Design a protein with these regions (language model features):
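Short glycine-/acidic-enriched loop or helix-start segments at secondary-structure transitions
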Residues: 19, 58-60, 82, 166-168, ...
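Catalytic core of DAGKc-family lipid kinases
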Residues: 80-153
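A residue-level signal for conserved active-site and pocket-lining positions in enzyme catalytic cores
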Residues: 12, 48, 74, 124, ...
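ATP/nucleoside-binding phosphotransfer catalytic cores, i.e., glycine-rich phosphate-binding loops
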Residues: 118, 126, 131, 142-145, ...
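Glycine-rich phosphate/dinucleotide-binding loop and adjoining beta-alpha-beta core of small-molecule
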Residues: 49-50, 55-78, 82-85
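ATP/NTP phosphate-donor binding region
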Residues: 1-46, 50, 58, 62, ...
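A glycine- and small-aliphatic-rich helix-loop capping segment at beta-alpha/alpha-beta transitions
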Residues: 64-68, 86-91, 170-179
Length: 267
């Protein structure tokens, strides 16, 4: 990659990262890199995120439209999507600013709801809008009706989102590079509901079939709408791709072992 001239900076909104930010400024000054902060233009070559996976998610969504690659420095707990440890800021960013990074293209999700289009980086979830209430969801994949499933919800996750809520509910991890999404139920009340991996060009249609429980639709953890009885939403792979920047030697499997392997993060 070419060396970096301008870098946008995204920070965790509720954490004091002033010390880390000072370290980033020092590296940028030595490397001759201009830093851009919230509200500043300047067409950055890369975005540097100081935080964990939640802040990375916000950064990937923010720069999705203009195609700016996003690189994370981990100041969170898990940091699966981040490339540099918090105590390696100087060495890691010096390499990045010198052009030592590569880009992983990650698929996103498109959700159609009431004529509106939404894009998710991690996942979309349809769940009960009332805490503790079972919901009945009818779902179809690729135009094939697969019936009504009593459950707590349904997750559609991208490869990068497959290690989040999907993983916690027993769904498979999708390796970076797969152009696919995974459909996983949350606490299904059956022995037969299993996760399904779905490719590009296939629609997932989900409808609320509970007469007395509204369904909530969430995109990357944020609620966007409720579905009454008979109302539904459609999810598919979107044309847009997130651009995740990592160090050249890093791979999905090295990150997977470091973050989710035995003994990682206190597990």
């Amino acid at each position: 990659m070419q060396s970096v001239e301008r870098a946008a900076v995204v920070v965790h909104s509720r954490k004091d990262v002033s010390v880390a930010l000072g370290r980033v400024r020092a590296v940028a000054e030595r490397s001759g890199v201009e830093l851009l902060f919230d509200g500043e233009g300047g067409n950055p070559d890369i975005a540097i995120v100081l935080g964990g996976d939640g802040t990375m998610l916000r950064g990937l969504a923010r720069f999705l439209e203009n195609g700016v690659p996003v690189l994370g420095v981990n100041f969170g707990r898990v940091g699966f999507l981040t490339a540099i440890k918090g105590d390696e800021v100087e060495a890691g960013l010096a390499r990045v600013f010198d052009g030592e990074y590569r880009i992983v293209e990650l698929p996103t999700l498109e959700l159609e709801l009431d004529g509106q289009r939404h894009v998710a980086v991690n996942d979309t979830v349809v769940t009960s809008a009332e805490l503790g209430r079972l919901i009945e969801l009818q779902y179809a994949i690729g135009g094939e009706d697969l019936g009504v499933q009593p459950c707590d919800g349904l997750i559609c996750a991208t490869p990068q989102g497959s290690t989040a809520y999907n993983l916690s509910n027993g769904g498979p991890v999708l390796v970076w590079g797969l152009d696919a999404l995974v459909v996983t139920f949350v606490a299904p009340h059956t022995l037969h509901a299993r996760p399904l991996v779905v490719g590009r060009g296939v629609d997932i249609v989900v409808e609320n079939r509970s007469p007395d429980v509204p369904a909530a639709v969430l995109i990357d953890g944020d609620p966007v709408a409720n579905l009454a009885l008979g109302e539904g939403a459609t999810v598919r792979l979107a044309p847009e791709h997130s651009r995740l920047a990592i160090l050249p030697e890093q791979t999905f499997f090295t990150r997977y072992g470091q973050v989710f392997g035995p003994g990682a993060n206190g597990r």
